[in-house]
Amino acid sequence: METLTFKAFRAVDDPSMCAEFLKQHRKVLEDFGITNVTTNNEDWTTDPDTYVIVALSNNNGMVGGIRVEVDRGTRDLPIHSALYELDHRIAPALTALREHGNGEVCGLWNSNKYASLGLPAMLAFAAVSLGNQIGLRSMVCLVAHYTLRHALKSGFTILEDIGNGGTFTYPIPSIKAIAMVIPDVIALSTAPQEHRRHMMSLRLRPEQERIEVLGRVPTRCVYQLCIDKKVLDLRAYVEVLCMHHQHVATA
């Protein structure tokens, strides 16, 4: 049985892993004919507020990845860099979210060998589950139309006040990009119940193993989502549990 390990780390703590992430992500973009993405740069690799999750196969090495970039107001989020010239309204929208703790889920990719197996959704779930560890209340993302379903599963909703109802032609004419937000990453009330349970499980037990079916193949999935392997603040867990019980009671 194949083993997939989902490993989270601060970007500055593992330069070699970041370099491999960049290499594989660019290869996937080139396969789609995309070479001019403004946000496909190396700036994030030296940002202490960028967190990375990679999917590592015991058979095939790094097969997917995703990032969470926390908005401290010192460096533009990728979504700002991508959309500001298309619609200046992205700036005040992000400023309003930053006050309570906001970050961007970005840089999602998976190798072609793992296409249509559900890996993007698994990476997105893992990324969203990090919210409590890194002090976020909201998360934003910019997704291509063909990955919209993964964002919706994770609880993202469309930022309809910018662009054409949240939609932009970016980065090439054949791709529609959608700006999205999870307004409350702690409660995750915008996520479908089945997927919300999964993300809450990863949040409450960030170090776990489970058998999941990718395509039709059972796969051993090992989650290593504790940043720095530190002891997590149990007060955050208590808050998550209370909100979970409240949500169940009112569902």
Task: Report each predicted region and the residues it spans.
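Conserved acyl-donor/pantetheine-binding loop and adjacent beta-alpha core of acyl/acetyltransferases
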Residues: 67-111, 171
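A short helix-loop-beta-strand connector motif used in the catalytic cores of GNAT acetyltransferases and
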Residues: 44-54, 73-77
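A structural signal for short, well-ordered beta-strand segments and their strand-loop junctions
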Residues: 62-65, 104, 138-142
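Conserved acetyl-CoA-binding loop-helix of GNAT-fold acetyltransferases
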Residues: 115-129
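Active-site beta-strand termini and strand-to-loop segments that position acidic
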Residues: 55-58, 182
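Conserved beta-strand in the GNAT
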Residues: 54, 61-70
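Terminal substrate-recognition subdomain of acyl/acetyltransferases
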Residues: 1-35, 43-46, 108, 112, ...
